[in-house]
Amino acid sequence: MMDCTWTLPGMRATWQPAPFLPWDQTPWRVSFSWSPVLLAWGGVWSGEAHPCAHVLRPPASPCPPRPRRGCGDSGSSGMAQRAQAGSNQSRGKCGRDGRCPPRSSPGAPEAAERVESAETRGPGKSWILSPSSMSEPRRGKARRSPGRRRHPHSSFPQASSPSSPSRRETIPQVQSSGVPGAMSPEQTLFSRSPRGLSHLGQSLCRTVKESEAQRGKTMPPGSHSPSGAGQGRTARKGPAREEIPSSDSSAKPSVYPHPHLTAT
């Protein structure tokens, strides 16, 4: 009997050495089992007549492959299984009375728990859900929590953040700055939220209305020339603005506190 201990388990192909080198030489057997070049040179053989076929290939079972579901159940699937197993009764290895052998799988009590949970939870839920899926409402509540952001890439601050009151306090500085339209990075970030944008718009509209009211007080009714507008702008008391020289008559005077603002 040949020693087959050197063959790897689960090896599907069987190999035959050259006919002029006998099997009983130990150096050839070692080199044949470890050298891939000699394995490729030896060639593939069928495996039935090989002396190590019982090690290289597992023996084929006489029973047909067991179906995945419907085994032992009542109904058409069970009748088909009994009819199929009736032809294999002569071998005597497919269970008694032509039925499938009972399964001893660890998932059987889990399936019973699933059916019980489906009865307790009502017809609206699917029976496939296991009792461990009862944590879904908790995950849903955590997803709706006010402190958590809706998207990781969103740069909009939440109303419940502790830094929002400090940003709200810095909004009146827009009126007292050198250029009313210029904002600090904190004010720019806060103006993205709807509440901050409304406060900022109200403060800017208030500044525009005050400037228009003061312009009507300081300017004469008939003076609409650039020089007169420039003189009236220098004599007025109000927020600091860009000064336009009165000699440049071609340049259009800035009527509003910021070039991007329009009258409302």
UniProtKB/Swiss-Prot annotation:
Residue ranges, annotated region (Disordered): 57-264
Compositionally biased tracts (Low complexity): 154-165
Ranges annotated as biased composition (Basic residues): 140-153
Domain of life per record: Eukaryota
Protein's name in the database: Putative uncharacterized protein PSMG3-AS1
Organism of origin: Homo sapiens (Human)
Gene: PSMG3-AS1
